[in-house]
Amino acid sequence: MLTGCSTAKYYSHAVVGHLQLTTGQTPIQKVIDNERTEKELKHQLELVIELREFAETKLNLDVGKAYSKYKHLDRPAAVWVVYAAPAFSTELQSWKYPIVGEYQSKGFFKESMAKDYSAKLKGEGFDVYLGEATAYSTLGWFSDPLLSTFLDDSDEELAEVLFHELTHRTYYLKGDTMFNESFATAFAQKGVQLWLKEKGELKRLKKYQDTLRRRDEFRGVLQEAKTQLGLIYKNTSNDPVDTLQKRKQEFFQSFKRTCLNLRKKWNSKDALEGWIDEEVNNAKLAASSIYLLKVPYFTELWGQADGDPKTYLELVKKL
């Protein structure tokens, strides 16, 4: 439980962090026109201009002035995000915020603060997962900056992240993390496919769709794992802690083997490395579920809208 003093400190840090991200921005076109700007950065910024226009005119998203100005960051992430779950539960801890309501993560603009808070939660017995967010969204309250951390991935990944964040800006259901993230994930994926199709990039479209099929296969594995682990905790809740801990450890070892088998099936040496080579716990399992588990539902809704973005958004807002 946060004390009043620590809450004030957190919000003070949040205000300062927000100002650091939103001041000192440069219009994208000005960066492009600068002869000192590297070729790759110019390409990415020109792509963002194209994607913003597509998002507004074809996807019916609220673009406004979001991501129209560039900000370079000398760090790998915009925000460090802490997720926590009890030692024997797959349900994430929630925190309350003034604008978005309850949210199942806590973000920090300083990595050191995120690590300190993670250590505090671990000391209280929680499983903790510390992730990095490369994008930043104020849900339409401000004109969000295009951060350099945005631009490390492929064109398709950049498009997906941009469409995801603009989806949040367009519609956000207060207090329902899984709804918002799964909806934004599903809509962004459909948006990328429409964009590639309009450009006539059929080979890239097929490659992207192959990636989505792999993600969907992993989503099924993740959903099954979360369900099974939840049942283990429920059915053994009265067992000694040592017994619970052993079963938990055995479960995650088995889960890693399943991920390794998927990697072999896909013939991709780097696939799922965050699940195979790094620690996996309740918090990481549950955090990933937020973004994936309801995606099939929102994908099905896309079919009900006959693939029309405007109709789709109207259907989502009625849910």
Regions found by a protein language model. Give the residues of each.
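Acidic/His-rich structured neighborhood in mature extracellular/periplasmic domains
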Residues: 50-215
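Extracytoplasmic/secreted envelope proteins and their assembly/folding machinery
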Residues: 42-45, 49, 114-118, 159-164, ...
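Sec-exported extracytoplasmic/periplasmic mature domains
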Residues: 33-37, 50-60, 167-171, 188-200, ...
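Amphipathic alpha-helical packing elements
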Residues: 18-55
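A well-structured
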Residues: 41-42, 51, 62-81, 93, ...
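Pan-zinc metallopeptidase signature
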Residues: 220-319
